[in-house]
Amino acid sequence: MVITAFAASGLLIAITCAVMAMVMLALARNPLNLIWGIFCLAVLFWGAGAYFIGISSNGFEAVLWWRIAYIGVIFIPVLFLHFVLSFLRIRSPIHIGFFYVATLGFLGANLFTHSFIAETQLMFGELHYMVPTTLYNIFLGWFVFAVLFAHALIWNQISMAQGSRRQQILFFFLGSFIGFLGGGFSFLPVYDVAIYPYPNIAVALFPIIMGYAIIRHKLFDIRVVLAESLTII
């Protein structure tokens, strides 16, 4: 078994997101922590899926892991937007329920049909990369819209916030921007852009930056985090 660079990045993503998810889900009584914990689980699905995609020896096996990985990827935009709206305490002009309905539609197509992910092609001599379908193209457009919309909301709040609150939002924007930018390179080979998705490893930096923000800038109340975690132990 050969561990490709793509597989290694997926493994690192899975590890960092698993740690963050465990901490946040331990605090599930706070809705903000719950949403962020579930978001980390969604990214964990991508990381674990990317690992197994990276070590798949044939296209049939890779298709299975692409579908498993996209169980998480499909939920990433709606959970990220939901967290942003809750964290910033603002109302979206587009109801979050619309995004969840769309998410369930894409999830159903991924799990029960071949209209979302159907086949792969060999890329870079080692990766069985998925081939886009019409429905996948629609999903990607929706993904990009939701993520850019969420980042626009964050950026707007940075300009209005002050003091420690501004630092919190700024670190969150930095972490999410790096994570989504790095993860975005994983979409390129889908469309025959022959750039190896090395930057996928940047997704693992997102939980690390968030962890720093939690401790340094009290993005979440670290005293509550420690107290709740010790209670559960």
Language-model features, listed with the residues they occupy:
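Individual alpha-helical transmembrane segments in multi-pass integral membrane proteins
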Residues: 2-17, 27-150, 173-176, 195-206
